[in-house]
């Protein structure tokens, strides 16, 4: 492994016990599959995952932060693949009531999926394991999680700011 990084971000938007999923076609890094809205960081976004996510959200579905409520950063995952370290930053939000979502997307097909069907969709390994944790645990708490991907899944730990106690 050469120490190359690939920084990516995604947002999963919910409304009425459904999650907005994108059937992404033509990705450079994954086969056609279901995922959140998102993509790669631009060079000027390397220290700002939220800005990268908001740019991708606008480019792909025409939404901005004002269309969302309860926007939270929930997960960062690491995975070694194809000689690089892939860092994924995952956000979650609710779509504000009366927000109009365009039906077309230049990256693939959008679909509102019932919560109980989300995990039945074919999706990238890391996204699926993260969503399994989110659906069983993460959506019920205010924690932020870090995860390291293994062939068996993702090992999650809560990210805690302990700088007040230590130098």
Task: For each feature predicted by the language model, list its residue ranges.
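Conserved N-terminal beta-strand and adjoining loop/helix that marks the start
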Residues: 1-21, 41-42
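Conserved Nudix-box catalytic region and its N-terminal flanking loop in Nudix hydrolases
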Residues: 18-58, 145, 149-167
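Active-site-adjacent beta-strand/loop module that shapes the phosphate/pyrophosphate-binding cleft
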Residues: 17, 77-100, 129-138
């Amino acid at each position: 492994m050469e120490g190359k990084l690939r920084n990516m971000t995604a947002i999963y938007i919910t409304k009425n016990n459904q999650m907005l999923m994108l059937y992404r076609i033509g990705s450079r890094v994954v086969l056609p599959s279901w995922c959140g809205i998102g993509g790669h960081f631009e060079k000027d976004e390397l220290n700002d995952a939220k800005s990268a996510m908001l740019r991708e959200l606008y480019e792909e579905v025409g939404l901005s932060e004002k269309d969302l409520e309860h926007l939270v950063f929930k997960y960062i995952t690491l995975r070694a693949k194809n000689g690089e370290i892939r860092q994924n930053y995952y956000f979650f939000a609710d779509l504000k009531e009366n927000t109009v979502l365009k039906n077309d997307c230049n990256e693939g097909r959008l679909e509102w999926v019932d919560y109980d069907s989300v995990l039945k969709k074919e999706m990238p390994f890391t996204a699926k394991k993260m969503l399994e944790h989110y659906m069983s645990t993460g959506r019920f708490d205010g924690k932020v999680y870090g995860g390291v991907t293994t062939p068996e899944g993702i090992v999650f730990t809560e990210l805690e700011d302990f700088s007040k106690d230590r130098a």
